[in-house]
Curated annotation (Swiss-Prot):
Organism: Rhodopseudomonas palustris (strain TIE-1)
Protein name: UPF0335 protein Rpal_4670
Protein family membership: Belongs to the UPF0335 family.
Bilayer-crossing regions: none
NCBIfam families linked: PRK13694.1
GO molecular function: DNA binding
InterPro entries, sorted: GapR-like, GapR-like_DNA-bd
């Protein structure tokens, strides 16, 4: 049973798909590494803030709130206030 060179070579479409898949995986890996670096940088900033006497939990809350839409944030604050009043916390 003889194998020809054409039979051993892969289809060009298969090669293209493999190359494309490899490129996608490598991009994801690079982005994951960048994400890790950025996460480390953010952690360092919070540590610096804590060292300067700031409350990290409050900072995280403010960052999260600033990401929200103003109307969404106002609605959540209203609900929170209503619940706190119902529990006698205000």
């Amino acid at each position: 049973m003889a194998t020809s060179a054409a039979a051993v070579q892969e289809d060009p479409a298969t090669n293209f798909a493999k190359d494309q898949l490899r490129a996608i995986i490598e991009r994801i890996e690079r982005l994951e590494e960048e994400k890790k670096t950025i996460s480390d940088d953010i952690r360092d900033v919070y540590a610096e803030a804590k060292g300067n006497g700031f409350d990290v939990k409050a900072l995280r809350t403010i960052v999260r709130m600033r990401k929200q839409d103003a109307n969404e944030r106002a609605e959540q604050e209203t609900i929170l206030e209503t619940y706190m009043q119902a529990l006698g916390m205000l």
